[in-house]
């Protein structure tokens, strides 16, 4: 199985499976001389790790990241400085329950990658989904922690903006609220609504989809290139690579189809300091594939997890009809823990384009 690497200059390779002894990543292309502490990476993994509320999978993983290479430890015994060589990171799996998956070793769960993996490779790791499990994304979040160090002054933040048909009220948007509730919601008023709604979903053994919004502020103008190296193109590709993602939009996205040219185009004026300013940001901070200097705004939709308790029709590897009820521990809404994953993917895309722009134009922004 190839295609486990993404990026051009800031390259990330992830490895490992859901029920293996460990998983991790190798970050190649990180510039030398960047200093950080382990806690600077762990904070993002803690945001993604399972078992933190009744609304996510109850699998218990500490997700403690270990940095194995690519850094030198400073005299204080805590600060690490990148050397420019590959940074290898490892996260151990400690709470696997492979016995929950014995019955589906030869059966294809509807909505999962079981059938297509078997079809393509002739073999699949059925234990927790193996490589197709969202467990792999812990390594991406670790890589995203490194990516955040690369571009000075950039802040990447994400929030859950919709669960099922229940959307936030954007007039209530408050970033300070995001880490104060189990949903990463910027709207405190929607939290009790989501709690009641997801409790019902969870008790029925079902699942529901969601929409996540990621905003990168402080992105320098000029990142990205026309046609085949657009910044939004690469952001969309990385977000689409996340498990269960079925749609991505930048800026106004699909809503742009409902607006006129007058309403959609972001008008400009010269600011008092002699620099141009935009009067709106319908484009999501990107024009012609190149960043404008405005906040980069992306949203992505995740489908309901296919692991539900409802019995469903399928087939097995011998071509027989079977009825399947999924066992194991699963998220009733995978969108919750997708928030830090989306942040990591956007951070990696911005870091990669920052290094590519620096290499092409020679400008240090």
Swiss-Prot record:
<comment type="function">
    <text>This reaction introduces a second double bond into the aromatic ring system.</text>
</comment>
<dbReference type="GO" id="GO:0005829">
    <property type="term" value="C:cytosol"/>
</dbReference>
<dbReference type="InterPro" id="IPR000453">
    <property type="entry name" value="Chorismate_synth"/>
</dbReference>
<feature type="binding site">
    <location>
        <position position="288"/>
    </location>
    <ligand>
        <name>FMN</name>
    </ligand>
</feature>
<dbReference type="GO" id="GO:0008652">
    <property type="term" value="P:amino acid biosynthetic process"/>
</dbReference>
<dbReference type="Pfam" id="PF01264">
    <property type="entry name" value="Chorismate_synt"/>
</dbReference>
<feature type="binding site">
    <location>
        <position position="329"/>
    </location>
    <ligand>
        <name>FMN</name>
    </ligand>
</feature>
<feature type="binding site">
    <location>
        <position position="54"/>
    </location>
    <ligand>
        <name>NADP(+)</name>
    </ligand>
</feature>
<dbReference type="InterPro" id="IPR020541">
    <property type="entry name" value="Chorismate_synthase_CS"/>
</dbReference>
<dbReference type="GO" id="GO:0004107">
    <property type="term" value="F:chorismate synthase activity"/>
</dbReference>
<dbReference type="GO" id="GO:0009073">
    <property type="term" value="P:aromatic amino acid family biosynthetic process"/>
</dbReference>
<keyword id="KW-0057">Aromatic amino acid biosynthesis</keyword>
<keyword id="KW-0288">FMN</keyword>
<comment type="subunit">
    <text>Homotetramer.</text>
</comment>
<keyword id="KW-0521">NADP</keyword>
<keyword id="KW-0285">Flavoprotein</keyword>
<protein>
    <recommendedName>
        <fullName>Chorismate synthase</fullName>
        <ecNumber>4.2.3.5</ecNumber>
    </recommendedName>
</protein>
<dbReference type="GO" id="GO:0010181">
    <property type="term" value="F:FMN binding"/>
</dbReference>
<dbReference type="InterPro" id="IPR035904">
    <property type="entry name" value="Chorismate_synth_AroC_sf"/>
</dbReference>
<keyword id="KW-0456">Lyase</keyword>
<feature type="binding site">
    <location>
        <begin position="303"/>
        <end position="307"/>
    </location>
    <ligand>
        <name>FMN</name>
    </ligand>
</feature>
<feature type="binding site">
    <location>
        <begin position="243"/>
        <end position="244"/>
    </location>
    <ligand>
        <name>FMN</name>
    </ligand>
</feature>
<comment type="similarity">
    <text>Belongs to the chorismate synthase family.</text>
</comment>
<dbReference type="GO" id="GO:0009423">
    <property type="term" value="P:chorismate biosynthetic process"/>
</dbReference>
<keyword id="KW-0274">FAD</keyword>
<feature type="binding site">
    <location>
        <begin position="131"/>
        <end position="133"/>
    </location>
    <ligand>
        <name>FMN</name>
    </ligand>
</feature>
<feature type="binding site">
    <location>
        <position position="48"/>
    </location>
    <ligand>
        <name>NADP(+)</name>
    </ligand>
</feature>
<keyword id="KW-0028">Amino-acid biosynthesis</keyword>
<comment type="pathway">
    <text>Metabolic intermediate biosynthesis; chorismate biosynthesis; chorismate from D-erythrose 4-phosphate and phosphoenolpyruvate: step 7/7.</text>
</comment>
